[in-house]
């Protein structure tokens, strides 16, 4: 466990990713007991704690994914918003570290082993002014390391991302910064395991200062270039170096290195994106062997992982810290107050004598400069109408006066305003974490907000809310405690109309199916019985303004009228002339009232006089029906105005 760099430990009743610090107890006695402690630091936090090795486990990507899936599917009461954000940020940092380590390990799997190097000679050895062709042949045929190995050795001390170097910087400054040497010497032709270990130590000795001091942009050598001694003039330096100075170490015996030992120009990037011109002579790549040319075309990425092996842990830690500092906070913390009001926004509104209270904008009428808002309450109905207010009376929820408005509301309704703020905060946290996407009203109606809503609905009687209208223009009920919301009462639909329809169905069956009123109607048509409805019909004008049918259901009325039309046709046209030829009017004004009165008398077992009075009174309407009818008239009048 102590060999692991990152672990997963329990802290504050949660599994947190942490980094194992130095100084952890590793005694053999404790290891046998499995009771030694680990010094760890929570990722993305400065908190350092001690945990038992038995309670910690090596951090893996699978653990992070399991924790993330459990967070997305949790249904319990959410933690504090800031703690939730901190925990999720720590998990994200751990996932980034694991991905980075996985990427570096995959690159190291294809990296060739670092070449062996010889001890470097002082830069004071003067190089020869020219190179003979015989020397080139000897060098090309020597069993020394290949060109690609020397290139890897040359770049192994560079940090990742610094392979592209610039030319044009004076080579004397490069000698001063790097201690007079910028490139490793040639590798020995023969060597065993001891030579390899010695070369590794020597290579680390001269590469460590380079990682600390930083690379000079002019340290990349060009193929076929030599370094002029510092005692020579500037003109000789310019002539010898060409596009930029380079530093090559001479082998033992005072020989100069072949131009094959330098790095190819095609692997070094310039600012202008061009390569320095090559010299056609012993320095020209055209005279290189086929093996060297093939190695010259190998990509630079093969040598990149070597640089990661020589990077100090402090450099890696500094890179991680810079990434953490550059992280942007969640968008919910970077809120800027908008200039206009839109549908779904959270606002403050002052209603009557109560303090400013949070509300949701349901609709906006730009032309009238008004908006419909719905106050956030314990028993808020997301489908409520809300109240119409002027836009200038609204304030954005995150305005500058937010804290003052909260303090004012806490004076009388501390518990209620605290619940409203917690509901809004939970909504914004879920938006930022991506666990919910939608408006606030959709969030309130969804199951994801039930834990927060239940916390107030279970104690709605003891929580004091302001008596806000919630869309109803009525004032608070007289006699109720001031500032306390009345108990919620479910309103059942009115069943009076259905009861009357069932009673009238008996009258229809008596008239149509039983034909109980047919003899009474025939007697009236033949003038055997007097009828006040027939007298009114004959003495009235041609047009009637209103007809009382008594039957409220249209299907029942259609059945009775069709039956009366048949009775009227069977009676003949004797009374049709006196009825001005209007059969429909005769049926509705004479036959329909007489048939219904006869049915009421028979079904209710009352005399004709009582049944006639009941017909004239009409159906008995309930108080609920009268109230609904009055409200419909008011809405119609307001719509016309």
Curated annotation (Swiss-Prot):
* A GO MF term: nucleosome binding
Localization recorded for this chain is:
Nucleus
Q: Using the UniProt annotation, give all residue ranges assigned to the region (Disordered).
A: 98-329, 463-486
What biological-process terms (Gene Ontology) are attached?
Answer: chromatin organization; DNA repair
Binding partners and assembly: Interacts with TP53BP1 (via BRCT domain); the interaction is not dependent on its phosphorylation status. Binds nucleosomes. Interacts with trimethylated 'Lys-36' of histone H3 (H3K36me3) (in vitro).
Q: Present the record's domain note.
A: The PWWP domain mediates the interaction with nucleosomes.
Keywords, sorted A to Z: DNA damage, DNA repair, Nucleus, Phosphoprotein
Which GO terms of the cellular component aspect does the record hold? cytosol; nucleus
Q: Which Gene3D superfamilies match?
A: 2.30.30.140, 6.10.300.20
User: One Pfam family this chain carries?
Assistant: MUM1-like_PWWP
Q: Which residues are in the PWWP domain?
A: 343-404
The name under which this protein is listed is PWWP domain-containing DNA repair factor 3A
What is the originating organism of this protein?
Answer: Bos taurus (Bovine)
InterPro entries in the record: MUM1-like_PWWP, PWP3A_3B_4, PWP3A_3B_4_C, PWP3A_3B_4_N
Q: Which residues carry this modification: Phosphoserine?
A: 156, 307
